[in-house]
A protein has these predicted regions:
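Hydrophobic or amphipathic alpha-helical targeting/insertion segments
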Residues: 108-149
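Catalytic alpha/beta core domains of metabolic enzymes, predominantly
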Residues: 153, 160-306
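Glycine-rich, proline-tolerant flexible connector loops at the mouths of alpha/beta enzymes
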Residues: 68-90, 122-130, 187-196
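N-terminal amphipathic alpha-helix/helix-capping segment at the start of soluble metabolic enzymes
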Residues: 17-49, 300
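Glycine-rich phosphate-binding active-site loops on the catalytic face of alpha/beta enzymes
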Residues: 117-131, 218, 241-255, 340-353
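Active-site mouth loops of central-metabolism enzymes
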Residues: 41-59, 78, 97-105, 160-169, ...
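Alpha-helix-loop-beta-strand connector modules within alpha/beta enzyme cores
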Residues: 82-101, 136-148, 206-214, 301
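Hydrophobic faces of well-ordered beta-strands that scaffold small-molecule active sites
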Residues: 44-50, 75-77, 99-103, 121-123, ...
Length: 359
């Protein structure tokens, strides 16, 4: 086989493998949440949640503005009482991303939230289930032209079952009957559990039963590291299977950290591109520099770099490697890279050495 044929065969094999593992998203309706459209025809949206009371308008706005800077697409806020509901209008005026009112127990708070101008209402079928109450919320949403998320949680199901996944799905399916009779279709669905397997099973079943967009996440995930792992595994598997139109990484941590993890997850699956990708080796006894410190400083610089989101820079893969064993090889596979030794760093560009720097 000559060189030209070998190159052609290599290209064919490469494209075949890429297509085999390319994520094909589940086909869904499009639902508009404020200025954001979600569904299979749109990017997977990143969502987070405010961790203070809505009635504390200043603190709520402060948190949301930080989330905006972090790259959050949609923000949810708990509405516990009438004072919280009345505060939503002021919050909405001072933020730039869609606001979702999280409603439990009292459907009248959803009516006030719709009146206040929120962009979506979340209802829990486990604690707002009386038909006339749900119909009232649907009517308010229709009037305000906003969608409703049917958000089932394993911890608040009305009927307990050993089959947690089945119970989550049954809860939503039963709830959907009210919406169908009201001819309301601007719906988003979530079925969150604290068990990864149950959550995945519930979402897969629901995905086969309807064409509504799915908000994907885990609930009650534990301490921050546990939450990152559980959410990344559960959500990552679903996204890889094409399931998920908005995501939230639920963490007992700063809301901005939820957004950071969500962005890394989407970036790693090739579903969103949030800027240049930094890869580093884990370091070992051969590493003669403080690679973690260098990588952190470089990432901070990269985050502040003007134009990092431009088409020329956002697709870059940059490698910082700690020694000469795997460093040169890994750095060669990146668009730009540096392999460190004690006194110098070897610079690579598109696989070729382009210089050295003294340390």
């Amino acid at each position: 086989m000559n060189e030209a044929k070998a190159k052609k065969l290599t290209l064919v094999l490469h494209n075949t493998i890429i297509n085999m593992y390319k994520i094909e998203r589940r086909k869904t309706r499009t639902v508009k949440i404020g200025k954001i459209k979600i569904g299979s025809g749109h990017p997977v949206a990143v969502q987070s949640m405010v961790k203070v009371r809505a009635q504390n308008v200043a603190k709520s706005v402060e948190e949301i503005r930080k989330l905006e800077i972090a790259g959050c697409d949609i923000v949810r806020i708990a509405v516990e009482d009438e004072k919280d509901a009345r505060a939503l209008k002021d919050i909405k005026k001072r933020i730039n991303i869609p606001l979702v009112a999280d409603i439990h127990f009292d459907h009248r708070l959803a009516l006030l939230a719709a009146e206040a101008g929120v962009d979506k209402i979340r209802l829990n079928p486990g604690n707002i289930y009386r038909v006339h109450e749900v119909r009232a919320v649907i009517a308010a949403a229709k009037n305000a032209r906003i969608p409703i998320r049917i958000g089932a949680n394993s911890g608040s199901l009305r009927i307990r079952s050993r089959d947690a996944a089945g119970a989550l799905v049954a809860s939503v399916v039963d709830y959907l009957k009210i919406f169908k009779k009201a001819r309301f279709k601007d719906i988003v669905i979530s079925l969150k559990g604290s068990d990864i397997t149950d959550t995945i099973t519930a979402y897969e079943k629901m995905a086969s039963l309807c064409g509504y967009p799915l908000h994907v996440g885990m609930t009650a995930t534990g301490l921050p590291l546990d939450g990152i792992v559980k959410s990344s595994v559960g959500i990552g598997i679903l996204l890889f299977r094409g399931i998920g139109d908005t995501i939230r990484i639920s963490l007992l941590d700063e809301p901005r950290q939820e957004v950071a993890v969500a962005k890394f997850l989407l970036n790693s699956l090739g579903l969103r591109n949030f800027g240049p990708e930094l890869i580093c080796c884990p370091a070992c006894g051969r590493c003669e520099v403080d690679l973690l410190k260098k990588a952190q400083r470089f990432q901070e610089w990269l985050d502040k770099l003007p134009g990092a989101q431009s088409s020329k820079l956002k697709n870059l893969r940059i490698a910082l490697m700690g020694c000469v064993v795997n460093g040169p090889g890994e750095a060669r596979e990146a668009d730009l890279g540096i392999a460190f030794s004690r006194h110098k760093g070897v610079l690579f560009k598109k696989g070729r050495i382009c210089g050295t720097v003294s340390l």
